A protein has these predicted regions:
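Conserved class I S-adenosyl-L-methionine
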Residues: 1-53, 58-65
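Class I SAM-dependent methyltransferase SAM/SAH-binding core
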Residues: 62, 70-116
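A short SAM/SAH-binding and catalytic strip from SAM-dependent methyltransferases
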Residues: 127-138
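A short glycine-rich, Lys/Arg-flanked "PGG" loop and its adjoining helix->strand segment in the class I
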Residues: 141-153
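Conserved beta-strand signature within the Rossmann-like core of class I S-adenosyl-L-methionine
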Residues: 152-160
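Short, glycine-/aromatic-enriched active-site segment of Class I SAM-dependent methyltransferases
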Residues: 162-180
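Short alpha-helix
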Residues: 180-197
Length: 219
């Protein structure tokens, strides 16, 4: 099975549990402990994107691998005039659409079932997100290049660290469930952006413990 199909299958099965990571009040004390210390970066990334989002104007967002729409809906609530969320999991997109409707931002959010490589758009975005997206790509450079082409502003993308204490358990979990996951060194991330024409002076990395988040200015 190709990696895209393995990832799709994994998140179709795991959509409800993944979305629940963001719901502190609905979990047992043990589940809160596990999510905070093992998967806490998921929520930390949301806080970081909030802090880096534009605050003025009619700005737009492309959210690649949008999952249950937590980032898309949150940014629409914070003023984004146009949000395009893209994912390969119908189950995830169903959650995203329900969340947008529940928060009264459905008219500003569009959710598309597609792989990024098959996506066709004729617009550019002020902010493009690849949060929890590059974890699951065997050949990330094509997707990163396309994301930059769709952006006139900033790309924010997370990359799980290659050398981090949670790597062995995460590798094992995906291996046992038939999924695919990859990890990155800081040098590899810098090379990826350099290969698509983003020099070091337009890129910085934020260390979130388990992940690096790259913030690249696209001109």
């Amino acid at each position: 099975m190709e990696s895209t199909e393995r990832v799709r299958s994994h998140f179709e099965r795991d959509a409800q549990r993944f979305d629940a990571i963001y719901e502190e009040e609905k979990k047992s004390a043990f589940a809160r402990f596990v999510d905070r210390y093992v998967r806490g970066v998921v929520v930390e990334r949301l806080h970081l994107v909030r802090a880096l989002a534009p605050v003025k104007g009619a700005w737009s967002v492309l959210d690649m691998g949008c999952g249950p729409g937590r980032f898309s809906v949150d940014l629409a609530k914070r003023g984004a005039a146009r949000v395009l969320g893209v994912d390969i999991s119908k189950e995830m997109l169903d959650l995203a659409k329900r969340a947008a409707a529940a928060q009264n931002v459905a008219e500003r959010c569009e959710f598309v079932l597609s792989s990024f490589r098959d996506l066709q758009v004729k617009e550019t975005f002020d902010m493009s997100l690849g949060i929890g997206y590059f974890d699951y790509l065997e050949n990330p450079i094509e997707d990163l290049q396309k994301m930059a082409q769709f952006t006139k502003g900033h790309v924010l993308a997370s990359f799980p660290k290659r050398y981090e204490w949670r790597v062995p358990s995460r590798k094992l979990r995906f291996m046992l469930t038939g999924g695919f996951v990859r990890f990155y060194s800081k040098a590899e991330i810098l090379r990826l952006f350099a290969s698509i024409g983003v020099p070091a002076d337009r890129l910085y990395l934020i260390d979130l413990g388990r992940d690096y988040v790259a913030v690249a200015r696209i001109v």
